[in-house]
Design a protein with these regions (language model features):
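C-terminal active-site subregion of NodB/CE4 polysaccharide deacetylases
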Residues: 1-83, 90, 118-129, 135-138, ...
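Short acidic, Gly/Ser-rich segments with clustered Asp/Glu that frequently serve as metal-coordination loops
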Residues: 86-93, 98
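Metal-dependent polysaccharide deacetylase catalytic core of the NodB/CE4 family, i.e.
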Residues: 27, 32-33, 100-285, 320
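Short amphipathic alpha-helical segments and helix-helix/interface helices
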Residues: 50-53, 96, 201, 223-227, ...
Length: 341
């Protein structure tokens, strides 16, 4: 019996197997700078980015995002594409030079609502407000038309800027009152429309006694900077809505305006067609089938999500998976790529 089983196993091993379909991966970066307070792990240092790009180009052929699916259909393998979300100004000052040095093309997805004024994304503003400096012992406010009350207990005093510059991330259970406050406020603000969110943040700044200021480290691209970035040979610009809303929580009309409006705004600035889109936040709960239809209707050729997974020739071009890269050392970075494909 044992000999028969061994012989059968040998026959299976020797039997020619159909070659696996070529697969690729798409990397997703956000900020390039020093992490500081970074509850969502969005920041990769410039040095780490350079290491990642070097490791990536040594192991795969990095191609422009818009070429990826067609190359897979032709049977090309070991491909990768690089993307950056949210339109941080460091895409121009930090990422672009390192991409050029490595000879790596990339797509930068830009939110357009702040192209004409200095601005930060709301989650960065919230983290700075919650973790930098002393706070009142109780947060007791009306936010977005509903009462919000939370006690900070012993966590109200002192500077907690290091609380999230370490093991805690916002998807983990909060270890203290500041982290709990941040997550509760984040969840409250996430589904709001932009005007409601601004009013809520104004109320929170007044409660905390924190002056509203746009930090150079978190500032978004201006129109002039976007135009400069788009001139780089290795950079493609994609759309990422106007105000970075949770699209699934918005009306169909508001979704359509956010999707098409961002494309139109970018095209006015860079004077060339925009064919790629990325869903804000990008998990499956953040957009719907209707959202995908609206993206198609707006004239885009592809759209990216924020769900890890490989890409093959049969992948839906309007739900392309991406691996969100964190500030990993080069060995962990390489291991993550290997595990994905």
């Amino acid at each position: 019996m044992i000999r028969g089983a061994l012989a059968a196993w040998r026959r299976r091993v020797r039997r020619p197997r159909r070659a696996a379909a070529p697969r690729a991966l798409i990397l997703l970066y956000h900020r390039i700078g020093e992490p500081g307070v970074d509850p969502w792990g969005l920041t990769v240092t410039p040095a780490r980015l350079a290491q990642h790009l070097d490791a990536l180009r040594r192991s795969r052929r990095v191609v422009p995002l818009h070429e990826l699916l067609e190359r897979l259909r032709r049977g090309e393998g070991r491909l990768a594409a690089v993307t950056f979300d949210d339109g941080y100004s460091d895409a121009l000052t930090q990422a672009a030079p390192r991409l050029a040095d490595a000879g790596v093309p990339a797509t930068v997805f830009v939110t357009t609502g702040a192209l004409d004024r200095p601005a930060e994304h709301w989650w960065d503003t919230l983290a700075h407000l919650v973790f930098a400096g002393a706070l009142p012992a109780t947060c007791d406010l009306e936010l977005a038309g509903r009462p919000f009350r939370m006690s900070l207990e012993a966590g109200a005093s002192g500077d907690h800027a290091e609380a999230t510059d370490g093991p805690w991330r916002a998807w983990e259970p909060p270890p203290g009152p500041r982290e709990a406050l941040y997550r509760a406020l984040y969840d409250l603000l996430l589904p709001l429309r932009e005007l409601e969110r601004r009013r809520a943040l104004d109320a929170l700044h007044a409660w905390a006694g924190v002056a509203q200021a746009i930090r150079a480290s978190h500032r978004l691209l201006t129109a002039a900077e976007l135009r400069d970035l788009a001139r780089r040979d290795h950079i493609e610009i994609g759309a990422h809505t106007v105000t970075h809303p949770w699209l699934a929580a918005q009306s169909v009309a508001d979704q359509a305006a956010e999707i098409a409006g961002s494309r139109q705004a970018i095209e006015r600035v860079i004077e060339r067609p925009v064919t790629a889109f990325a869903y804000p936040y990008g998990r499956t709960e953040h957009y719907t089938r209707q959202t995908v239809r609206l993206v198609r209707r707006a004239g885009f050729a592809l759209a990216c999500a924020n769900v890890p997974g490989p890409v093959d020739a049969g992948t839906d071009p309007f739900q392309l998976p991406r691996l969100q890269v964190q500030n990993w050392g080069v060995e962990e970075f390489a291991a993550r790529l290997l595990n994905l494909t």
